[in-house]
Regions:
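Non-catalytic DNA-recognition/assembly elements of restriction-modification systems
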Residues: 1-54, 68-71, 174-214
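Short capping/connector residues at structural and topological boundaries
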Residues: 36, 57, 67-68, 73-74, ...
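Structured loop/turn residues at beta-strand edges in well-structured enzyme cores
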Residues: 39, 91, 162
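Sequence-specific dsDNA recognition surfaces
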Residues: 42-53, 57-92
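A structural signal for short secondary-structure junctions
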Residues: 89-90, 114-115, 202
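A short beta-sheet element
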Residues: 95-143, 149-152, 158-162
Length: 214
């Protein structure tokens, strides 16, 4: 019964987060439709290339392509690697995108810092005010279609980094960006609360099952 209740509540929280993500996506699409001027993706972000030994990253969070779920569903779990491996050091609010077989649409808006391998592209907004906008831009199916249009290789296609940065994005005015960020911030806060609730339920489930099994 305890396990069923925890699973049921977690399922509700997952659906709530999916609905919140879809709501924000609809807002972004509507705002983008009203904007005529475009610019390159490189105008608001760049690739993170800083590398550290994995042992130097306090969170011990490791991400490879296997940890990122298809269809923009975030991560399934955190992986592990050797302490001496050099990894790309990502931070909270960076966007991680699997660069192997981009048609799987694997991406994650980082909720913590950590390290990722070379098969994962790490995008970082050039200014913090662009973080939520960057997330929404890379969330679009059109972005992944564009990446595939310049991908190299047949069996294991990879996106071309230079090509990706030429992706055309809407030029949000300061007022439009401010409005979007206010909504995005509210959505992100609610999603974070739901994630905390899911984690708490999972912890409670394990504690209760341990007690009952004695």
């Amino acid at each position: 019964i305890i396990k069923f209740i925890c699973i049921h509540n977690c399922s509700i929280s997952f659906r709530l987060n999916d609905n919140l993500a879809e709501y924000l996506n609809c807002i972004f699409i509507e705002l983008a439709k009203s904007i005529q001027e475009t610019t390159s993706l490189s105008a608001i972000c760049g690739y993170v290339t800083d590398k550290l030994a994995f042992s130097d990253i306090e969170t011990a969070v490791y991400i490879s392509t296997e940890n990122i779920l298809p269809d923009k569903q975030g991560v399934s779990s955190f992986g592990s690697t050797s302490a001496s491996e050099r990894v790309v050091h990502f931070r909270e609010e960076d966007v991680l995108v699997s660069n192997i077989r981009p048609y799987f649409k694997k991406m994650w808006f980082a909720t913590t810092e950590g390290g990722c391998n070379a098969d994962v592209l790490c995008f970082r907004a050039s200014d913090k005010k662009y973080s939520y906008l960057l997330k929404s831009i890379l969330f679009q199916d059109g972005f992944f279609d564009y990446v595939m249009s310049g991908a190299k290789g047949t069996k294991m296609p990879r996106g071309d980094k230079n090509h990706i940065m030429q992706y055309q994005i809407p030029c949000f005015s300061d007022q439009q960006l401010q409005k979007f960020n206010a909504l995005a911030s509210s959505v992100e806060q609610n999603q974070a609360l739901n994630r905390q609730e899911m984690a708490s339920l999972e912890t409670a489930k394990h504690m209760l099952l341990t007690i009952l099994s004695r």
